[in-house]
């Protein structure tokens, strides 16, 4: 099965390379006209600026401690002690802990679950 996969991969690579040469040779022989982008100047101002690093990490992104995670209830969960850390969902206690120790990305309010409240 592995050999079959390798053979198919090689055939696909050869096909892609040969079809690329056909397009290049046709272009050099003036059989294909180059496509001119009429609106290139119009969209020049709309190109995105370089992205700055965010001050907090979204769910699933790498983190070092709870204060790196964006959400109020997000916690930094690490495998094998301090390795392979990423932001995951926490709970109300996580929010309170972040409120006490974090100077940046400090939660303004901690959401409480409506499941435990008594009605009536």
From Swiss-Prot:
Residue intervals of the Agouti domain: 56-95
Signal peptide range: 1-16
Disulfide feature: 56-70, 63-76, 69-87, 78-85
GO cellular component: extracellular region
Residue ranges listed under propeptide: 17-54
Predominant location category: secreted
GO molecular function: toxin activity
PTM text: Contains 6 disulfide bonds.
Compartment annotation: Secreted
Tissue: Expressed by the venom gland.
Annotated keywords: Disulfide bond, Knottin, Secreted, Signal, Toxin
Family stated for the protein in its record: Belongs to the neurotoxin 05 (agouti) family.
Domain notes: The presence of a 'disulfide through disulfide kOR' structurally defines this protein as a knottin.
Protein known as: U13-lycotoxin-Ls1a
Biological source species: Lycosa singoriensis (Wolf spider)
Lineage: Eukaryota, Metazoa, Ecdysozoa, Arthropoda, Chelicerata
């Amino acid at each position: 099965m592995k050999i079959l996969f390798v053979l198919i991969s090689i055939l696909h690579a050869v096909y892609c390379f040969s079809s690329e040469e056909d397009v290049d040779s046709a272009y050099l022989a003036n059989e294909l006209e180059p496509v001119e982008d009429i609106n290139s100047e119009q969209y020049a101002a709309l190109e995105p600026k370089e992205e700055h690093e965010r001050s907090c990490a979204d769910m699933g992104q790498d983190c070092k401690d709870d204060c790196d995670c964006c959400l109020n209830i997000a916690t930094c969960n690490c495998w094998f002690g301090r390795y392979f850390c990423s932001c995951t969902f926490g709970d109300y206690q996580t929010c309170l802990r972040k409120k006490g120790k974090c100077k940046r990305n400090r939660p303004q309010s901690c959401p409480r679950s409506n499941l435990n409240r008594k009605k009536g």
